[in-house]
């Protein structure tokens, strides 16, 4: 496993991507631009959408990021992804698709639950995501205590997690955070969704001290600002988050806030910089699903190769520009125009 440079951990899901009318969203009390965990009342939704045209795409935020990151790296099998799957056909689909992108998969397998699924409901290029975690919910820290995973953790020089993983195995997240801090390895983290900050704030605040680079979109950043009593001004939130409690003081914390088509804000070493994303014609956008995940993938690819932050943001913007012109988190068959 000496080639593995980047370790991503998260909730492996198979996305069921479909276009729906607003009536479906209203029926299940869902909002566009939102992501939630499925409750009992949402479970009939998965069967209902299968009666229409559904595309099956590998998903899960960190898995999306790992695939895009590996796509933008010349050397394959340098990104490793882990999470928990079942023993069903969906697990095979996920493994095959993810490894076809050059990613090394080291799934924990749980035969007691089906592989997780996410209904991606698209309406006018906006989406609502409803996740039934299934086996992903059963990830255990014991996986990181196997000899194989210990070797991978030791080999990895960069770590990437997203907030969704905190609903499943917060002790695993802290375990990786501690390893990164103790060994002065960069630990990157995406806030992922406002509900995670609202309902799992104790877990988020426990992990943040280990985070060297934190990613969020404007709504996630504003939610964190409210929870921290920092207000809703993104500039203020970025500055305060950068200065917040940190375990590895050898590294300053960098804060990256994306804002869709508006400028990405980066707070680093006391300075706020704005970077404009690549403009995309509305008619060229197929699906905004995974725009944030792909930004993190591009950023991580550049960052893992020692690029300056400006170049990392450029790579993130490029990756998003490519992915939003695909359906779901589909990695293009062509080579990227920016590669490291």
UniProtKB/Swiss-Prot annotation:
Its EC number is 2.7.1.20. It catalyses: adenosine + ATP = AMP + ADP + H(+). Keywords: ATP-binding, Kinase, Magnesium, Metal-binding, Nucleotide-binding, Purine salvage, Transferase. One of its GO terms (molecular function) is adenosine kinase activity. Pathway: Purine metabolism; AMP biosynthesis via salvage pathway; AMP from adenosine: step 1/1. SUPFAM superfamilies: Ribokinase-like. InterPro entries: Adenokinase, PfkB_dom, Ribokinase-like. One of its GO terms (cellular component) is phagocytic vesicle. Gene3D superfamilies: 3.30.1110.10, 3.40.1190.20. It comes from the Eukaryota. GO terms for biological process: AMP salvage; purine nucleobase metabolic process; purine ribonucleoside salvage. Monomer. ATP dependent phosphorylation of adenosine and other related nucleoside analogs to monophosphate derivatives. Belongs to the carbohydrate kinase PfkB family. This is Adenosine kinase.
